[in-house]
Amino acid sequence: MNIFSFVYLAVFLLAGFCIARRALPQAGLSVSIPLGCGFGVSLLAFVPACFAVVLGFRLPALLLAAAVVAALAVWLARHSTPFTRVPDPDAAALWACVLPLAVVTLYLLHTHVLHLVDGSYHTGQSCYGDMAMHLGFIKNIAVTGKLPPVYPLLGGEHRFGYPFLCETVSSVFLVLGADARTAYLLPMLAAFISVYGMMWQLARQVLGSAGKACLAFWLFFMGSGFGFVYFLGSAEAFAGIFTGFYTTPTNYTAENIVWVNPIVDLLIPQRATLFGWCVLFPALYLVWRFCMEEETRLWRYLALLVLPLPLMHTHSALALVLICLACGVYTLVCRPRTKAVLAPWGWFALVCGVVWLVEMWNTVFAQSLDGQHMLRLHLNWINGQDDGTLKDNYFGFYIKNIGLVYLLLIPAFFHAKPKQRWLYGGGLAILVLAEFVVFQPNNYDNNKLLYIWHLLGCLLVASLLMDWFSKVRAIPWRALGLCLCCFIAMFGSVLTVGREALSDYWQWSADDIAMADYIDDNAETDAVFLTSDSHLCPVFSLAGRRILCGSGSFVYYHGMNYTAEYNAMQQLYENPDEVSLAQWGIDYVLFDSYVFSNIQNADESWYAARYPLWYENGGSRIYKING
C-alpha cells in the first residue's frame, strides 16, 4: 500500500533532518530542509542496501533498515539541542527561486512518468528513452530480491556495472506494496528539494549574497547558449521548436548544439544524475564550510552524506574527489599544517576511500576497466571526432552552447575572491579531465562532469554581473541591464522547457500494460524471456523480467559486449532449436508487433507446434518453454 511507502520515506527524511540540524544547529529551515532531504535520500540508498546484501532485497531487510534509521532519528532528537526557530532572512529569496521550478518540475513529472491516458501510458520527449530502462531496473531488483542485482538486459553472466543505488531507492517502495508510479516518483520529490535548495545555499555561502545566489541559481538551471538564433530565421523554424523531436535551442544536433537544459534533459529523465546531485550539492556546501570556513567538525557529516555516492552516480563521486583535491591543496598552501587542520582531511579520505573501494570494486570500477569502450582518451567532449579533429572551433563550440556564462568566465575568475578561485580550481580540474578522458562508451555522458564545472562557473559569473550592475546608479538602467543579460543567457532554456511541457508521446498501450501485469502475477521472478530488442519492451520495463537481449541503446552504452546475445536472439526467432533454447535458459518466448517489424523471418509456427500458448492479448502471444 502507498501509505506504508509514505511513512517509510518520512522516517528516512526525518532522520536526515535530525542529522542536518545536528551538523548545523544554527542554520535556518531554508538550509535544514534541503540538507535534510539530501541526508535522508543518502540513508535511503545506503542503509537498506547494507542489509539487503546479507538478507536479500526483501521486506525483512527493509524493515530492519527502517528500524535502525528510526532509532537514529530518536537518538538524535533526544541528544541534540532543543529545536528553536532560527532567524532566516534569506528564506524568502530561496523559496522565490525554488518554488517556481518546483511547480514546473511537478508538472513535468506528472505528464512524463507513467501518465495514464485512455488506458495507455504516455510520456514526454525527454523520458521516452531512459525511463524505460530505469523502470525495468527498479522492478527487476524488487522482484528478484538480489543485491548486487543481476543485469536483466542480457542473458548469460554479466556484471551489473551501472550505479544501481539510484534505482534501489524506488525498488524499496515496490517491495512495500506501492504502485510503480508512486515508487518511481516518491524519492525523486525529496531529491529535487535537495538539488534545488542546496544549489541555492551553496551559491549563497560561496558568494555571500542572496541576490547573487538567485542569479547563479537561474543561470545554472535555466541558462543556455545562443542556439535560439538558429530558429529565428522564419516562423516555421521557430514553431518547429515546439513540434519537432529534439529540435530545441539547447539540443539541436544538426548545428552541434548539445548543451541541454539540466532540468528537462538531465534531472527528470536521468535518475543517476538526479540522485547524484541530490547528494553532491549538499556535499559541496559542506565542503565549502569544512574547508574554506574552517568548520573542521563537519568532516563526519560530509563522510556520512557521501557514503553511497559512487553507486548512485559515479560521475558525481569523481567530481567531488577533484573538488576536494583542489580544496585540499588550498588547505596545504594557505592554512597551518597542523594536526588539527590536516587530521580531518585524513579521516575523511580514509572513511570514504575504504567504503567507496568496497562499493566499486566489483561493480562500476571493474566495469570501467574491462567493459567495452569504457575508459579511453578523447579530445573535446562531443565536439571531438574519432580522427582527432573538431566539428567546430573549440572556443566557438562552447560559446554557442553555453553562451554568456562562458564568455564571462575569465573576467569572472579574476574578479572572484581567492577562496572562490580555489573552489573553481576544482572545476577546472574537472574540465581538463573531461576534455581528455572518456569514462563510458557514450562521449556525450562526460557532460555529467562538465555540468559541475559549469555550476562553479555560474557562481563566479553571477557575482561578476551583480557587482558590475551595482555600480550603475540609475536603478532602471541597472534593472534593464540585468534583464537583458538574463534574457540572452536563458531564452533558449525557456523555449526548451516550454517544448518539454507540450510534448506528449505514447509509450505503452493498454495491451502492453495488461501483458506486463499478467507476467508480474504469473511468471517466475527469475524467468528469462526471449523478446525483441525494442527499448520499450514491456516484459522488461513494466514487468521487470530478464530478457535475452535488450536494446543496444542501453546495453552498448553500459559497456556490454552483447554480440552473442544479439545473434542468439536472431537465431532463436528465425531458426529456433531446443538445444539453443536450453543453452540460454529461455523460459518464455514473446511474439508481438516489435518482433515481426524487426525480425522479418520470425518463425512463430515452430513454437506454436511445440509449446503451449501461455498468454495472448491483442497482437501479443507468449509461449511457455519450460514446464
Where are these regions (language model features)?
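Transmembrane alpha-helical segments
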Residues: 104-109, 222, 226, 312-316, ...
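Hydrophobic/aromatic-rich transmembrane helices and adjacent perimembrane loops
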Residues: 189-192, 273, 318-321, 443-470
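Extracytoplasmic
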Residues: 473-627
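Membrane-embedded, hydrophobic transmembrane alpha-helices
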Residues: 1-91
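Membrane-interface alpha helices of multi-pass inner-membrane proteins
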Residues: 264-267, 286, 299-314
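Active-site lumenal/periplasmic loops and adjacent helix-entry segments of GT-C-fold
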Residues: 102-279, 315, 505-506, 533
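Transmembrane alpha-helix segments characteristic
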Residues: 297-308, 323, 345-350, 416-438, ...
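Hydrophobic, aromatic-rich transmembrane alpha-helices
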Residues: 282-290, 323-335, 400-421, 467
